[in-house]
Amino acid sequence: MQFGFNLPISGALAAPDIVARIAGEGEALGYDYLTVTDHLVLPDAAEPGYPYSETGAFFSADAFYRHEQLTIAAWLAAVTSRLRLVLAVMVVPHRPAVLAAKMLATIDVLSGGRLTVGIGAGWLKAEFDAVVTTPFAERGAVTDDYIAAFRALWGTDKPVIDTRYVRYDRLVLEPKPVQNPLPIWVGGESGPSLRRAARFGDAWYPIGSNNQHLLDTLPRYKAGLARLRQLTAAAGRTPDAVAPTYRVKRYGAALSPQPSDGERRLFSGNDTDIVGDIHALEDLGVTAIDFDFERPTEAAVIAEMRSFRERVLAKV
């Protein structure tokens, strides 16, 4: 089992020196990977219905200060030496396919093969309207075409591709990524996301707290995983070809223990409960879990990273 942490790249903690210190602390503490999120621009007024919070609230005023995901990942390749760099997740339609493939390959080379490409189709229409030339309603199909283009450019010399959204003929992309294949973790919890993971993913990378597709209890996660394995087999792959992972936005006392299905919510309760949840997910084959140590100050983030490592992860 690998354990990661979300690195703040927006708001008050996004100053470069703070980001570097938090990343360095995570590396020194023995975490396996860090994650960075992706938004290019944000609307002045948030659209309602953010799926990963109970209230639908998405961002605060200081979230407008936000580093571009791939740029910060390249910078982190230079300020870390061991941590894997996980994109959590890259909104695939936001960047042209060939440009994104080149940038991702470059980051993998600069990091010595430490990049993991978490991907998603996106959800914020106002952001799409500002930066994407393809229609918001077609984002799933665009994402699938772009992923296929990434794979071809990374793994084939002079590939040819002719799809609805990507066309090129015998392009040469060098250098190739260090990793072959460059791992793709498919985010999302919906039916289309599961089908995408089944077709393209090296791992499935869901957040448990999506209010529209909850995976916040052990039975719910088991059902999602069973569905993924059915879809993976239907896609012509071995059922367990896609490694399951899990993203934790809140935990412990910050999380209500009783969801709508009457079961105990994963990662609610005390430290012993959280250790038990990690073991339960490990028994299902989960290979990686990351936690969001969101706190108002750098000192508080680092203190929780240290404390959580001692209280919980050291007992797994």
Region spans (language model):
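Active-site-adjacent structural elements that line small-molecule/cofactor binding pockets in enzymes
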Residues: 1-316
